[in-house]
UniProtKB/Swiss-Prot annotation:
Sequence similarity: Belongs to the SELO family.
Protein name: Protein nucleotidyltransferase YdiU
Keyword terms: ATP-binding, Magnesium, Manganese, Metal-binding, Nucleotide-binding, Nucleotidyltransferase, Transferase
Cofactor(s) for this UniProt protein: Mg(2+); Mn(2+)
InterPro entries: SelO
Residues of the active site: D244 (proton acceptor)
Primary role: Nucleotidyltransferase involved in the post-translational modification of proteins. It can catalyze the addition of adenosine monophosphate (AMP) or uridine monophosphate (UMP) to a protein, resulting in modifications known as AMPylation and UMPylation.
Organism: Shewanella halifaxensis (strain HAW-EB4)
Pfam families noted in UniProt: SelO
Binding site for Mg(2+): N245, D254
Reaction equation(s) it catalyzes: L-seryl-[protein] + ATP = 3-O-(5'-adenylyl)-L-seryl-[protein] + diphosphate; L-threonyl-[protein] + ATP = 3-O-(5'-adenylyl)-L-threonyl-[protein] + diphosphate; L-tyrosyl-[protein] + ATP = O-(5'-adenylyl)-L-tyrosyl-[protein] + diphosphate; L-histidyl-[protein] + UTP = N(tele)-(5'-uridylyl)-L-histidyl-[protein] + diphosphate
Positions with a binding annotation for ATP: G81, G83, R84, K103, D115, G116, R166, R173, D254
EC number: 2.7.7.-, 2.7.7.108
Keyword ATP-binding applies: yes
């Protein structure tokens, strides 16, 4: 790997230098060849294993943990920071740079009495979800590898430590700006320096002046809205949408007790630590705006309030616009830019269908996938038999056919639905089965699941079992933040 060190060299005071604590008996548990290509790597090697496990230094790496703060479940925490993640620097790849971070590499000054380790199960989950979201075309950080060890760590019970090698276009979060707004570490000078660095590194078409700041914040709002629209369309619940878990680039970031919907539930809670449902599936769009408001508050000494408000007022429209693009693709609806009056009609049609799904306790992903088998020219839908409330479905289907209109090339239409509606998602029970395999020394379930998730829209008939509804024990699994 070749590195540059722009964050480390230009933002002194925004991090603490800290070196990994090596792990005993390091061994590869998972490797993403696709992610490796982003930073010019091909195959895992013994040299890489020693470096990424913290047992040897990597040439050109700087090793640091960033400091930030954030709103956690609505309350402000004045100092957080990378408590178990150590960044090596920005690796140079064929098409740009990627931060390389070792998550679980040992304690840092921001560990808050933690051991700085990650347990194997959380490392495997982060690896799988990072790669799954990428192949579902959802903006996300990436996972290069998981490195196992025989280091014991204690959570509720004794577990084994592992390291996830994470790649991110940037690790800058909403919480970075909050920290340098509210702390006494040279603010507001450091706040402006961070903003200028972010723009120059990641928005090179914008200037570091009032006009550039205005355009930048509007872009952050738009990118965040698009990210969350993607989540809602695919049925993904993040679980911990604290502001320190929000990427400034609109990438899905910091995976904990996430889940994809099994049976559709608007109020689905995937996080055992969120009994009130602050971060429930249906609350995510509103929380996205709330988090952006906290970011705007942190930037209010630099960016004019009118510009911040104008950008925030764009959020709902951007969210709905992108959500409609995705959902029309799932349903096979077409529209032109001159038919904006169809937006309300289509939102009602989409909402009517998801409500039917919820009342009939249907699987979200599998129900959408059935549109690839639908004959849209037929008055009788093969979907009808999936519903207990068939009268309700008939009423909805009549509205749907009227909106759809005439479809001349049915096979092409069906193929397009299969390109919009995945067959395979990372269901929590599948991740759990892969983790059990790793615990038993069998990497085959993990490797097979990784392979399938790389092509989620393909039939892959030999893996049909991985697309079925979960067994009773695996339905709607709720995870904890323990990692």
């Amino acid at each position: 790997m070749r590195f540059k060190q722009d964050f480390f060299e230009q933002l002194v005071g925004y991090y603490s230098q800290v070196f990994p604590q090596g792990i005993s008996n390091p061994h590869w548990l998972a490797w993403s060849e696709d992610a490796a290509g982003l930073i010019g790597l091909t195959q895992p090697t013994d040299e890489l294993l020693q470096g990424m496990s913290g047992n040897a230094q990597i040439d050109g790496a700087s090793y640091y943990a960033q400091v930030y703060s954030g709103h956690q479940f609505g309350g402000y925490s004045p100092q957080l920071g990378d408590g178990r993640s150590i960044i090596l620097g920005e690796a140079l790849g064929p098409q740009g740079t990627w931060d390389v971070a070792l998550k679980g590499a040992g304690p840092t000054p921001y560990s808050r009495h933690g051991d700085g380790r990650a347990v194997m199960r959380s490392a495997v989950r982060e690896f799988l979800i990072s790669e799954a979201l990428h192949h579902l075309h959802i903006p996300t950080t990436r996972a290069l590898a998981v490195i196992g060890s025989d280091v014991p760590v204690w959570r509720e019970t004794q577990e084994t430590a592992a390291i996830t090698v994470r790649l991110a276009k940037s690790h800058i979060r909403f919480g970075h700006f909050e920290f340098f707004c509210h702390s006494e570490r040279g603010a507001p000078t450091k706040l402006k320096q961070l903003l200028d660095f972010t723009i120059s590194q990641h928005y090179p078409d914008l200037s570091c002046d009032a006009a550039g700041y205005k355009a930048w914040f509007a872009r952050v709002v738009t990118d965040t809205a698009k990210m969350i629209a993607n989540w809602q369309a695919i049925g993904f619940a993040h679980g911990v949408m604290n502001t320190d878990n929000m990427s400034i680039l609109g990438d899905t970031f910091d995976f904990g007790p996430f889940a994809f919907l099994d049976t559709f539930k608007e109020d689905f809670i995937c996080n055992h630590s969120d009994p009130e449902g602050r971060y429930a599936f249906g609350q995510q769009p509103g929380i996205g705006l709330w988090n952006l408001q906290r970011l705007a508050q942190a930037l209010s000494s630099i960016i004019a309030s009118d510009d911040l408000i104008a950008a925030l007022n764009m959020y709902q429209g951007e969210l709905v616009k992108h959500y409609l693009i995705l959902m029309r693709g799932k349903l096979g609806l077409t529209t032109s830019v001159t038919e904006a009056e169809l937006d309300d009609q289509d939102l009602a049609l989409i909402g009517g269908f998801t409500s039917l799904m919820e009342r009939n306790q249907l699987d979200y992903t599998n129900t959408w996938r059935r549109f690839g088998q639908l004959d849209p020219s037929s008055s009788h839908s093969s979907l009808r038999d999936d519903f207990v409330d068939r009268d309700g479905f008939d009423a909805w289907y009549q509205l749907y056919q009227a909106r759809l209109g005439n479809v001349e090339e049915v096979e092409q239409w069906q193929a397009a639905r299969n390109r919009a509606n995945p067959k395979y998602i990372l269901r929590n029970y599948l991740a759990q089965e892969a983790i059990i395999g790793v615990e038993e020394g069998n990497l085959a379930p993990l490797q097979q699941l990784q392979q399938v998730l790389q092509n989620p829209f393909d039939e892959q008939l030999e893996f049909d079992d991985l697309a079925k509804r979960p067994p009773d024990w695996g339905q709607g699994l709720i995870m904890s933040c323990s990692s």
